[in-house]
């Protein structure tokens, strides 16, 4: 168990350092208050979820730490995760470059709104992992896994991705960049592609999933899609 905690701590530190590098190096300055606030919100949200899982659901924490292109088994998902990773990097780097070259001017209240959206995203993700102990970071069906149709899963089929949406939209705003929203062009197709491919996999491999999709019509956004 201690190995799991140390691994979680190590990954958190690596993630923090990588995020700091992706923000402050392209920005060319440490005088970037939006980045400090965003990192506090993002790291705080990530840490809160990690601590919750470490206490309440260590097995899910282990599943969720197995993440990234190399963790996926399906070749299609490996490709999708590469695009998703590049998209998230762009969500950080483009606003940082915007800060450096002053491409856009975002009011402070918009940046605060962005941080609120990021916080909302983490809150929605918390509700998902609290409801579903099989919410792994990779597409798989674990032994004994059943269809979850309660909580956020009663509203949309993919509440984890729904929770990611405000986080993605809020990130460039929190970092003080209108141009950063353009990076969503790279991320959103990967998200939708992953969602549809995951549904194909679950229809085939998770008993009861097809019946669940007839009950819950919306995939990502209620009354929209």
Give the role of each language-model region:
Residues 1-150, 162-225:
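Membrane-anchoring alpha-helices and their flanking helix-loop junctions
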Residues 154-162:
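Histidine-centered phosphotransfer motif of kinases
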């Amino acid at each position: 168990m201690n190995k799991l905690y140390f691994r979680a701590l190590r990954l958190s530190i690596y993630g923090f350092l990588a995020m700091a590098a992706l923000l402050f190096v392209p920005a060319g300055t440490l005088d970037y208050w939006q980045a400090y606030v965003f990192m506090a919100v993002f790291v705080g949200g990530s840490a809160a979820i990690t601590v919750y899982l470490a206490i309440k659901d260590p097995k899910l924490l282990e599943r969720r730490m197995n993440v990234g292109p190399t963790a996926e088994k399906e070749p299609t998902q490996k490709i999708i995760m590469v695009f998703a990773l590049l998209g998230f990097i762009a969500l950080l780097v483009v606003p940082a470059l915007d800060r450096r070259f002053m491409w856009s001017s975002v009011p402070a209240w918009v940046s605060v709104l962005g941080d609120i959206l990021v916080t909302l995203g983490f809150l929605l993700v918390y509700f998902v992992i609290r409801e579903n102990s099989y919410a792994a970071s990779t597409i798989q069906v674990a032994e004994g896994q059943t269809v979850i149709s309660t909580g956020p899963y009663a509203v949309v089929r993919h509440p984890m991705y729904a929770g990611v949406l405000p986080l993605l939209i809020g990130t460039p705003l929190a970092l003080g960049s209108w141009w950063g929203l353009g990076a969503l062009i790279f991320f959103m197709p990967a998200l939708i592609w992953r969602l549809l491919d995951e549904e194909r996999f679950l229809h085939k491999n998770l008993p009861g999933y097809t019946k669940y999709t007839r009950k819950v019509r919306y995939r990502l956004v209620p009354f929209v899609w």
